[in-house]
Regions:
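Generic protein-terminus/edge-of-domain signal
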Residues: 1-73, 80-82
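Conserved hydrophobic/aromatic beta-strand scaffold that supports enzyme active sites
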Residues: 45, 65, 89-91, 111-113, ...
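An amphipathic alpha-helical interaction segment
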Residues: 147-194
Length: 194
């Protein structure tokens, strides 16, 4: 019995050694085509070639999401596999264990990561945000209509434009407002799906 417990503990600990903790700061340093707001918000595009979770699982220290534009992938979130295809949004809670199990060569999702402090700065009604947070903890994959993806993609493009903008005085407020808009669109989609 004692040997069985030691073996199980050794297996868990060896898995943790291979788990990479990824900060938003690290993402903005290591990815190509990155747009960011300090260490609070990062938007980038991913590809099969720069898939960093294929070899080892990772855990991101903030909230994150991908919107699959083309291609397909199988993603493991906390040891549960999900098929991701175009017009799919996948949400990752902080410290979720993420691994890409399989990925087509043409897979191209948008990736967004944002810190807990960034979320706390956004003025969203708790009665609106809590059901969404709870839903994505249980069912992180949301299939959406192409029009929904296009609206969210346009908002992300606008956020990226503002991240490059010379309008520094109100940049944070503008980006928070656009992010809040994206959140409410996703909330609307989520309520429609229930």
């Amino acid at each position: 019995m004692a040997d069985t417990i030691k073996t199980a503990k050794a297996i868990r600990e060896s898995g943790r050694e291979n788990l990479r903790k990824v900060s938003i700061s690290r993402i903005k340093k290591e990815m190509n085509d990155v747009f960011y707001l300090s260490d609070d918000l990062v938007i980038t595009t991913l590809s099969a070639q720069n898939n960093t979770t294929a070899e080892y699982p990772a855990s991101i220290d903030g909230f994150s999401a991908i919107i699959m534009m083309t291609g397909e992938a199988t993603v493991s979130i906390d040891m549960q596999n999900y098929n991701v295809k175009p017009n799919t949004i996948v949400f990752f809670n902080p410290d979720s264990i993420i691994r890409t199990v399989k990925c087509s060569a043409n897979a191209a999702p948008y990736f967004l990561a944002f810190s807990k402090s960034f979320v706390n700065e956004i003025q969203i009604d708790l009665s609106t945000s809590l059901p969404v947070y709870m839903r994505f903890g249980k069912a992180p994959v949301l299939e959406v209509a192409p029009q929904d993806v296009d609206e969210i993609r346009q908002l992300f493009q606008l956020i990226k434009t503002m991240l490059r903008s010379d309008k520094e005085r109100y940049r944070h407020e503008i980006i928070r407002t656009l992010f809040t808009t994206a959140f409410y669109i996703i909330t609307e989609i989520n309520q429609r799906e229930q």
